[in-house]
Every structure is written in C-alpha cells, then in structure tokens.
C-alpha cells in the first residue's frame, strides 16, 4: 500500500491517464501537493473472475470509471466531488461567482472540475478483487499509511 503514498503521481488535468487500467478493482489516493486529501476504491463487488470477464468484453470498469467521474467535477452521485465543493471551492467563491451560479451563467460543477484539474493529483494500485480493495481502504482511513485522508478519515 506504500505505492498509494509514494508511487507515481498523475495529474487530473491530464485525464484520461493511460497508466490507469480500463478494467480493474483497486484503490486510489488523492493529493493536493503533499497533503493527503482522499482515499477511495472501486470495484467493490467484483471478483477476479468478474474482472476477467469484463476485460474480455472490453468496456471500462472500476478504477478507470471512478477516476473519470472525479475528473469530471460533477457532484451528482460523486461524494468526492461534493467534498471538494464543500471544503475547497465554496470558501473561495466570490460574490460575483455566487451570483453567476444563481443566474446559471456558470455551474458549481465547472468550478469543482477546475479546482480538481488545477490542484489535485492521484496515485493508484490495482487489487485482485473488490473485497481486497475495500479492506485496504478501511485500513488506510484508519491511518495505516501513517496519515489519514483530510476528507474521509475514519471518525
């Protein structure tokens, strides 16, 4: 799991990132500079057999789709993007931006996407199945990397 703290960083501004497998269960850590912001996983219910079946189909699944959703900045159905909006974007909004959002001249989601692309990067690791990813995610939320994520630590 040290790879999630010290492995190669990938910028959200470079999405899609070729290194991310198109079909995989696994984990990802999100960083703002050297600050550990978030830990996430994808492929929760996927067995190794299910992952292989999906590879044969050739349709993206798991890590790729989850990171793509985060890169989009859309808050609907994406808790990470909600956290980014609440903790990083909303406190920085000017009165002019708030007015523009209320008049539908700009969207909050577009500002969330801009923030993610301008400030955040990620690391990832593939796991053999979703159950393994879920277990490791819980350990990391508890501090197994020596630090807890800012946005989603275990309370």
Which residue stretches match the model-derived regions?
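Short, conserved catalytic or adaptor-binding loops enriched in Gly and charged residues
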Residues: 111-118
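GIY-YIG nuclease catalytic motif and its immediate N-terminal context
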Residues: 1-96, 101, 110, 125-146, ...
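Short, aromatic/basic-rich helix-turn unit that serves as a nucleic-acid recognition element
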Residues: 122
